[in-house]
Amino acid sequence: MKLCITSLKNQKEFELINKLGEKFYERYFILVIAKKLPKIFLESKYNTFLGIKVSRKLNKKAVVRNKIKRRIRHLMRIIVNDSNFKAIKFAIIIIPKKGFEEINFSHLQYELSKIILRNIY
């Protein structure tokens, strides 16, 4: 079964997940994972809510920041549609750190999936 991912749309949703979620600090990114979601998220047809914060500190060029966002979205699609992933509702905010754009894709996938799978169940 293919699971659906939707993005967090406004500042209120980001603040809510920041308040309810648990933070995990890694070498290349910071994760905020909220397993207990408020009613507005539970009524949705989507299983996974994704928020991405890419600061201008990371890179001044919008092209590079957008590439980082595309990589993160693709990583999440791979992780959520993996056979080991169970369909539970959760929200996640990913904040990349310096050096994120230089790391190869397979290493990022391994790191991100390890952290997400370990902390949402």
Curated annotation (Swiss-Prot):
First-tier enzyme category under EC: hydrolase
Keyword Ribonucleoprotein: no
KW Aminoacyl-tRNA synthetase (keyword) present: no
Keywords (A to Z) from UniProt: Endonuclease, Hydrolase, Nuclease, RNA-binding, tRNA processing
GO cellular component: ribonuclease P complex
Enzyme Commission no: 3.1.26.5
Catalyzed reaction equations: Endonucleolytic cleavage of RNA, removing 5'-extranucleotides from tRNA precursor
GO-annotated molecular function: 3'-tRNA processing endoribonuclease activity; ribonuclease P activity; tRNA binding
One of the GO biological process terms: tRNA 5'-leader removal
HAMAP family hit by this protein: RNase_P
Self-association and partners: Consists of a catalytic RNA component (M1 or rnpB) and a protein subunit.
Similarity field: Belongs to the RnpA family.
Described function: RNaseP catalyzes the removal of the 5'-leader sequence from pre-tRNA to produce the mature 5'-terminus. It can also cleave other RNA substrates such as 4.5S RNA. The protein component plays an auxiliary but essential role in vivo by binding to the 5'-leader sequence and broadening the substrate specificity of the ribozyme.
Protein name (database record): Ribonuclease P protein component
Species of provenance: Rickettsia prowazekii (strain Madrid E)
Gene: rnpA
